Amino acid sequence: MSFRAARIAAVAVASISLLAACSSSPTTTNSAAISATTSSNSYPTQDVVSSVAEDASLHSALLAADPSAASGLTLGTTYSPGLTGLPHAGQNSSGENIGADVDLRNAIAKLLGTTWSVQNGTFDTIIPGVQNGKFAVGQDNFGVTSAREKVVDFATYLTDGQSLLAPSDSTLNAVTDITQLCGLTIGAGAGTTFQTILQKNAAKCAAAGKTPYTVQYFSDTAPIWLGLANGHIDVYFGPTLSLKYDASHVANVKFLSQISSTPVGFVTAKGSPLAKILAEAVNKLIADGEYAKILAKWSIDGYGVSSSRVNPAATL
């Protein structure tokens, strides 16, 4: 479900004073000043990883499953410079990777007695890379879906959701039913859980006697931010944690509400023993209290899992 890496491109475009408002949209009266610049360069810096110690049984299980893990595991993800990928992942001014996803994977590596060889790709290449063996593990806010579970295995570690963000002067304040979006133009990521949900519910507006919503799908978020600024897009449908972060750091936008939630997990090759080992590692971190420290650091306490599961039943 990740649309995180593409948000980086939006900042470069949107931060140079986005287009003046020119919309007759019924929900937007003046969206001129939306600017995807961070209002603060601060981020949490406490160390939540060094206290994690290697677990001998998990280390042995890892080497039995993959002897090459003694020299490290390859992890496929997307490049996230700056702070705009937070709370999941980003980079500080020193080029150090930061974020909840980063802390969690580093804690897991310590627990397993291994290291990560992080390789960056694009969101749509990570799962194929896991399938063909390029990556041992993929991590990029992948939501569990039935389609994905057919080709990779999941070890869950977080719950994220599908939420809505709009210009601050939008007449929308909370969306409890998708039919409230009827007649509006929605921006969303192509090939994501957001597209799945919008397509699945597309007929509901007509059934309610309302004008259907229009969706514009993009491979990165720069056009969505531009659309919000010039009134061509009424709402942005994206991941909950990212949009909540954006609402706190982007001028003149507001978080509306969450429509649904989805477990998020590491992905491994179908049938790989690594999924079970990763789930056991997450569960060990939960039992030891280390997992809670990571969530608290990034203020996402309410989005954790009570236990990591391999291939839970998908709702999408």
Language-model features, listed with the residues they occupy:
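Bilobed "Venus flytrap"/periplasmic-binding protein-like clamshell domains
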Residues: 81, 94-110, 142, 160-220, ...
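C-terminal motif of bacterial Sec signal peptides marking the signal peptidase cleavage site
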Residues: 17-21
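A ligand-binding cleft/hinge motif common to bilobed small-molecule-binding domains
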Residues: 125, 141-149, 199-200, 227-260
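Extracytoplasmic small-molecule ligand-binding "clamshell" domains
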Residues: 30-139
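Bacterial lipoprotein signal-peptidase II cleavage site
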Residues: 22-32
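Periplasmic-binding protein-like
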Residues: 159-166, 244-283, 301-316
